């Protein structure tokens, strides 16, 4: 339903795709390339928030989290690279990572572990394809209200940290809640930064434990 609503508002191509399935990704990217002639920028945004004590989490759940939060990005990025290499006109990969990749939260390991792997995946693409003019960067955001971090998840994370939901959402150095618009601006900045690759931009209101160099 949401896809239909989006399609009615913008002149865009909306496709159903299981990003954890290589064949599904391949079909979708083939249609994209045929429709627009190629791909200039990939914003890889897939993810599911899965919590649990890491020593006790069900193995099936942990493996599914890696499918959702790591391999989905690898599937999309690898198909994008194939298209970009054929185009031979440079390109840009952008990954929605998470502050969990460098600053894990209590009982949130099933989500944080694949995000840590995703951060390194982002850097690996920068190393492997920089010579082709293909940039790879990421955004480490934190506590953004979305379909992923919904009211129920916010209450759960606030309880784990023994704070109120308002304190949880403003729990940063600036004491300001970070919004989706702030993250969008970060992605745009990286998309147009032609001399930047292998970088991870934090958008979290300030969290020294999650800060990078």
What are these regions (language model features)?
Residues 82, 127-131:
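Alpha-helical segment proximal to the catalytic Tyr-Lys
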Residues 38, 43, 130, 135, ...:
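Short, small/polar-rich loop/turn modules that mediate ligand/substrate recognition or access, typified
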Residues 131, 144-171, 213:
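A glycine/serine/threonine-rich, flexible loop-to-helix segment
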Residues 48, 55-75, 94, 118, ...:
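Catalytic Tyr-X3-Lys loop
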Residues 98:
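Residue(s) in the substrate-gating loop at a strand-loop-helix junction
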